[in-house]
Structure formats: C-alpha cells, structure tokens
Amino acid sequence: MEGSWSYKLLYVFLCIVLGILYGIANPILLAQGLGFIFPITSSNGRAVDSIYSLIYPTNLNVFIRLTIVSVTVFVAYALIFVFNVAQNYVGIKLYQQTCATLRWKAYLKMQSMSTSFFDTQNNGDLMSRLTNDMYNIDNLFTQAGGQAIQSLFNILTTSVLIFLLSPVIALISLSILATLITFSFAFLKKSKTSYSQVQNNLGDMSGYIEEVLTNHKVVHVLKLQEIMIKDFDQYNKSMIKPTVRGNTYSIFLFSWFGFISNITYLVSISIATAFSVNSIPSFGISVINYSFMLSYIASLRQITLALDQIFTLWNLVQLGVVSAERVFKVLDLNVEKDTATIDKLPDIKGNIRFENVAFGYNKDKPTLTGINFSVKHGDVVAIVGPTGAGKSTIINLLMKFYKPFEGKIYMDNFEISDVTKKAWREKISIVLQDSFLFSGTIKENIRLGRQDATDDEIIAACKTANAHDFIMRLPKGYDTYISNKADYLSVGERQLLTIARAVIRNAPVLLLDEATSSVDVHSEKLIQESIGRLMKNKTSFIISHRLSIIRDATLIMVINDGKVLEMGNHDQLMKQNGFYARLKQSSVR
C-alpha cells in the first residue's frame, strides 16, 4: 500500500509541475505571439526576434500568423486542463485514502486505551475529533492541499521566470511582496489561536449535546428543558467570539493581499515605463516594449494569483492544521502496554481468589483495602453493601478494567497480571444493569457473544434466556433490525437479549451487576429464570438488591467502606445479627 501511495504522490507531483510549466509558458507564448503577429522594431529600426520567428518564416500573412499563435496557446491551455484534471483525480483518491487511514488509526488508538482513560475524557469531544476534526483535515487535503502545493511551486518557478525577464524589476517587485507579506504573519498566528479555540469549544459542545440526547428521558421527566437550553445557549455563544475573530483576521488578510497586489503592479509598471521612456537597459533585455510588459505583468499576475489562492484557502488551512493537532494528540496517546505473557488460557473451572487486594480510582483515596476471599467452581457469590461501598469495583477488577494497587487476583492458578486482557476476558461473561444493544439484527447482536456461533446455537441460547418467544413475535424474527434506541423493545426484553449473549459465550465465570433492576414483575420472573439456567456450572458473582436473588447465593460477601465485613450464606449472616442483618431489615422497612 505504501509503495502504491508513493507512486500516486509522484504522479500527482509530476502533473502539478507540468501543469504549472505550461501555465507559466502561456503568458510568454501569448506575448511573444503578439510580437510575431505585429513585428516590433527597436530604436535602430531592427526587428525584435520572437520565439515564433525562430520556427516559422516571418513573411507569412497576418491571418496565418494569428492562427499559429492561437493554436499554440490553445494547445497549452488544453494541456493545463488535462494535467489539472489528472492530478485532481488521483490526488483526491490519495487524500481520501490518507484521511481514512488517519481516522482508522485514531479510532484504533481510542479502542486500545484503558477504561481509566475514558473515565477522564469527554466522549463528545472524542467523537468530535473523529468526525468534525477529520472533516476539516479532509477539506485541508482535498480543497487546500493540492492547490497549496501547486500555488507554492507556481510562485517559485514564475519568480525565476521574471528574474530572467528583468532581474532589476523582478527584485523590486518581489521585495515589495515579501515585505508586505511578512507583516501578515502576526495575523496568521492570531487567527490560528482563534480557530484552535473554536475547535476546542466545538468539542465541549459536542460532549454536552451527546450527554443531553443520551439522557433525554431523564431531562423530560425532571423538566430540565429550560436549564438545558440555557446551558446549550452558553456553549453555542462560546463559538461566536473566536469564530468572528478568526474570520475577521482572514478577511483582513485577504483584503490586505489585494492591496499588496495592486501596489506591486503599480510600482512594477511605473519602473518598467521609466526604463522604457529613458531607454535604460534592464540587465536582461536591451529594450522594454509592450511585448515585454505583457509578459512581465502576466507572469507577475501568476505569482499574485497563486498567493491569492493561498490566502483564500487560509481558513481551510488554519482549521485543518488545528484539527490535525487535535487528532494527532489522540495518536500520540500512550497506550498502556499489556506485559502479560499468557495469551491463551486452557479450559479452566473458574475458581476465583483475591489476596489482600487494594485499589482506588484516586490513589489518595482507596476504594478497596485488604480484600481477601476465595470461591470455587459453581459457587454463587452475592456482593452486598450500601451505595459506594465498592461492590462494582470488585466486578471492574475481575474484568481487568483496572489494576489493583496491591495484592493478587487468581483464576484457578493463573494470576491476573500474567494473563493478557483478551485471554482473561474470554473466560468471563457479564450482564450489566444497562443492557446495551448494538445497531444490527437480533441475530448479529447475540453472535457478538461468540463470533462463530451458528444460527441453531443462537436460537438455543435465546430459548435458554427466555427471549425466543418475544423474538418470534417481532416482524422479522431474528432478522429484526434493532439498536440501542429500540424503544419498541421493553427494558426486560433488552435485558433478556444481553443474557442470551452471555449464554452463547458460555464462559466459566459470570458477572451480574444489577441485572434485574428497573424491570416489571413479569420480566423479572423471566430474567431470574434465565439467570438461573445461565449460572449452572459457572462461578457467578451477583450484585443485586433483590432479596430473592441474594438469599439463594452459596456465599454472601458484605462490603462497606471498601472492606469485607462479613461472609457466609443468608441464614448464617442473619444469625450473626450483624451488618448484613441490619441492612436487610432496613431494606424491608
């Protein structure tokens, strides 16, 4: 692929060069053609040679000479057209491949980041980097990239040409341009700062919109629309000032450059006229006539047009550069390396052991301290405790979302730090409180649990999860298209689908985090039945406030303030009349 890109880039560059060379030749061919059609004589009466007269006889009639010049200039224009189309066609394909690769690498980097990274990031801003910022980079490549390269090369080659025409006048003209353009750099820097602020504010606003739309039902229930509208108004208004400032700088630069061009033309024509009137040689030509003036002004126009194109595209360039910086910040993120050496676990039973485990989302404030327990294959462990006690943190550690500060976690005799994340998680199924469904058919969603699952296995898993009956009532059965926003599925039905996904995975360790909350009585019964089947021959960890689920656990682990206070089955803990008993009594009241 890289070799193919190299050839395409070379092809684009050659087309740009050839197009520019023919573009430079055009004003010369036209000016020299006028000298060929209407012969020019010097002050001593001698005819001034034209490049056409070196090829064609000078005694041709005017109509033939006009035809020769017209055809020559037309061919040059046609070649410019061909080379421009060719370089744009191949260039656009190349630029799109580059943008697609850049977007893919940024997405891959995000997917490689640890859970702790997303805990501290604005998801909307990350989405903005992959969408809005990549759109700006795409514009930079497709609209500004090739044109900027072409314009810069045009400036370089045409500058050489006008030096050949008249070094003195060229030096004066280019000095004026360079001096006035240098003055522009201060504004270019200020406009980049403004556009950088625009993109950052846009990322913040995208994050806010994503948050509000995701929780739109909560917004309506709590009647927060007016508050959300006011907050959005603040985000929206934060875009105005930097956008206006950045565009004002750009408009000023564009107008300023028009002024620069006019001043340069005026000075160049004045000097050339003075040289001509006073018969002063110009270190390259012995006589200055209207043919020279036409060639020189047309060539100078090539330079100013190229600069004009660069300034016109400057908004796109600034936005593209700022967006590229934001995307490359993602690409430069340090991925936490998985130093584990075991990338494949054998068939295991699912014995789990915690040895003096300590962890905290903030190192200065531990969430868990001194956690010790051991469970065997087939055990059902209910983790109970008040809100914020650390129940879900144990699940997060078991899923290897985070590393413990101290202690060790074992699955059978394999220590968690020795096993890669992929290999460790292959042995675990999880059903969360928030049942997330991906866009696709029901069959595709279930197959996410195990990619090689057959249709028959999917149907069997859904029957185990009590999901088959309601699936068959849907318009297209297992081929019904759903998404995470599928409101025609009840909360209970969505949860049954996630349970079916866990069934098809058939991992030896099962994690259930409030899997039966927020459902009606009928759905709860179906979910409990399906969970009961799912837990057979598995080591299961359950977080739930449902007494009916907790009391059937073989082991209940009571956690408070990040510590294990009590362990035992329901009857044992109730007899102790300790924290668990008080917790249950308060929940009944």
From Swiss-Prot:
CC per GO annotation: plasma membrane
Residues holding ATP: 385-392
Name listed for the protein in its UniProt record: Putative ABC transporter ATP-binding protein MG015
Record family assignment: Belongs to the ABC transporter superfamily.
Keywords annotated in UniProt: ATP-binding, Cell membrane, Membrane, Nucleotide-binding, Transmembrane, Transmembrane helix, Transport
CDD domains: ABC_6TM_Tm288_like (cd18547), ABCC_Glucan_exporter_like (cd03254)
Transmembrane feature ranges: 9-29, 66-86, 161-181, 251-271, 280-300, 303-323
GO MF term set: ABC-type transporter activity; ATP binding; ATP hydrolysis activity; ATPase-coupled lipid transmembrane transporter activity
Domain ABC transmembrane type-1: start-end pairs: 9-319
Superkingdom as given in the UniProt entry: Bacteria
InterPro entries according to UniProt: AAA+_ATPase, ABC1_TM_dom, ABC1_TM_sf, ABC_transporter-like_ATP-bd, ABC_transporter-like_CS, P-loop_NTPase, Type_1_exporter
Gene source species: Mycoplasma genitalium (strain ATCC 33530 / DSM 19775 / NCTC 10195 / G37) (Mycoplasmoides genitalium)
GO process terms (BP): transmembrane transport
PROSITE patterns per record: ABC_TM1F, ABC_TRANSPORTER_1, ABC_TRANSPORTER_2
Principal location: membrane
Pfam family, one: ABC_membrane
Topological type in the membrane: Multi-pass membrane protein
Localisation per UniProt entry: Cell membrane
Domain spans labelled ABC transporter: 352-586
